[in-house]
């Protein structure tokens, strides 16, 4: 999970012998990362993006995370492959102004909480799902 990734990153810094307080490590992590893209191996053996989470900063001693999109599994097809869709949390990410500054225009409707986009199993294209292609094309340009 994105939260687990942050804990592991913090642990790696501590194991490296760097003499920094935990708060300083968290401040560095929170200021360095804007998004966490969580990819997971599913029960069918495929890997899929299962969440896109924004790092919103530090609140007290806690790195604040906000899911933007999550993958919702709806079942499996006749071949045993996981089926599902991306669901928006309804939160407009704070980095949208940076996207616009780089000329990346995403339709705001994809951030509507009622918006979801089915993920098609297309073995010829590892980046399945229209949302993932559209969104990640923008993310990768940053």
Please identify what each model-predicted range represents.
Residues 48-142:
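NTP-binding/hydrolysis catalytic cores, primarily Walker-type P-loop NTPases
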Residues 1-60:
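Conserved P-loop NTPase nucleotide-binding/switch module
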């Amino acid at each position: 999970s994105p939260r687990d990734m942050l804990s592991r990153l913090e642990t790696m810094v501590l194991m490296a012998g760097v003499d920094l307080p935990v708060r300083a490590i968290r401040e560095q992590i929170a200021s360095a990362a804007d998004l966490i893209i969580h990819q997971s191996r599913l029960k069918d053996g495929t890997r899929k993006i299962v969440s896109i989470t924004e790092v919103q900063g530090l609140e007290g001693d806690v790195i604040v995370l906000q899911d933007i999109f999550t993958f919702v599994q709806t079942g499996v097809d006749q071949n045993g492959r996981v089926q599902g869709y991306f669901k928006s949390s309804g939160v407009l990410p704070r980095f949208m102004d940076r996207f616009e500054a780089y000329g990346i225009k995403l339709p705001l409707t994809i951030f509507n909480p009622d918006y979801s986009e089915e993920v098609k199993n297309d073995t010829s294209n590892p980046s399945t799902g229209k949302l993932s292609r559209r969104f990640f094309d923008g993310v990768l340009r940053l």
